[in-house]
Regions:
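RNA substrate-binding interface of SAM-dependent RNA methyltransferases
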Residues: 1-50, 111-112
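Short secondary-structure transition/capping segments
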Residues: 12-19, 58-60, 101-102
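Short, surface-exposed linear patches
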Residues: 25-27, 49, 67-71, 90-93, ...
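A short acidic, often aromatic-flanked loop/helix-cap motif at beta-alpha or helix-coil junctions
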Residues: 32-36, 53-55, 96-98
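Conserved RecA-like P-loop NTPase ATPase core
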Residues: 45, 69, 102
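Active-site/ligand-binding-proximal alpha/beta "capping" segment
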Residues: 51-91
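Structured adenosyl-cofactor binding patch, chiefly the S-adenosyl-L-methionine
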Residues: 79-123
């Protein structure tokens, strides 16, 4: 797992009490084209967007390897980004949610649907 920003700066948040930036690799790409050049092998781009073409999250089958793209709360994902996505998903409702909340809902859905196998030496 890793997190990334495109055309933006990562700001440490006082609400991030676990210091996520120190535990998960953070990549910053200057633009969307740079991100596209650095997508890991066999990864699917999933746009999270209120769009008529998008599938509802509760019906969505997550691919094994995915990059979830979330746009700005006020403008969403640009059309040229949505066109590059392999799939689009949306949450129910008519209003945009906070990006952090949306990301948490999508990742919770993924964790609930996609089995994770830990190595034999892993201790819980």
């Amino acid at each position: 797992a890793y997190i990334f920003t495109v055309d933006g700066k990562y700001k440490k948040q006082s609400s991030d009490v676990l210091r996520t930036w120190s535990r998960i690799p953070l990549f910053s790409y200057k633009d969307f084209d740079e991100l596209l050049k650095n997508i890991p092998y066999d990864c699917r781009l999933i746009g999270v967007e209120m769009d008529d073409r998008a599938e509802f999250l509760h019906e969505f089958q997550h691919p094994k390897r995915a990059i979830y793209l979330l746009g700005a709360e006020d403008t969403g994902l640009p059309e040229f980004v949505k066109e590059k996505c392999h799939m689009l998903v949306k949450l129910p409702g008519n209003n945009s949610l906070n990006v952090g909340v949306t990301g948490s809902i999508v990742l919770h859905d993924r964790c609930a649907k996609v089995p994770t196998f830990l190595p034999a030496h892993h201790k819980e």
